[in-house]
Amino acid sequence: MIYGSTGATHFDQLAKILTGYEITGARSSVIYMGILFIAVRSLFKITAVPFHMWAPDIYEGSPTPVTAFLSIAPKISIFANILRVFIYGSYGATLQQIFFFCSIASMILGALAAMAQTKVKRLLAYSSIGHVGYICIGFSCGTIEGIQSLLIGIFIYALMTIDAFAIVLALRQTRVKYIADLGALAKTNPILAITFSITMFSYAGIPPLAGFCSKFYLFFAALGCGAYFLALVGVVTSVIGCFYYIRLVKRMFFDTPRTWILYEPMDRDKSLLLAMTSSFITLFFP
């Protein structure tokens, strides 16, 4: 639709058109409808609410390496594409409102739905939806500070997710599927349990871990652009999220396991990956 109305595909040419230098009449509606479709496609791929319905079932049913890939790679590439499209062209109040709504809806649904999950991968799926909501705060602001906080947020989210799925891959060897199966982890593999706990605390945004820095920058950007309600929803959903993250830690360290599972040691590659990402999550505090 955009190409049919403008005859251009180069970002510089589209920037002039989208900022109004060469836009007239009915062509304007068609162009902005095309931009809206790009935004919806992007929100679908990053699993933002209300385009998230496919994510929990796909995350649960896919092999763990595929789930890890879907949790990280598409989000990084799509956020990069959104940045290119909307930084070169006119951002537009309508698109800001779309990201504003999707950000709030994703944070709320991600926090509330994750509380009811009993399976590890489904919990991580809804956690991912919630974090997409936090990251979308950067687009909702429409400011340089918002974009900077978004870049920090997606970088830290990627590291935390790599860390979490490296642990899930290690647990896959013993066919751990339910949260209740983690009851014996602290007793049979305390190092892995401590590492998983650090990752969950970082997801929850507990200082001084990297997840706290990510949310701090995003909420600060929201306050800076006057989006006080957005920042309030983010803080409240972060507090709610602490419940299900800390529930995992409680399960690993304090609950009696329903079945005793012998966890096999991780191989060298996963151990190195886990050590590097965990170190960054723990020590990142600018």
What are these regions (language model features)?
Residues 1-286:
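Alpha-helical transmembrane segments of multi-pass membrane proteins predominantly involved
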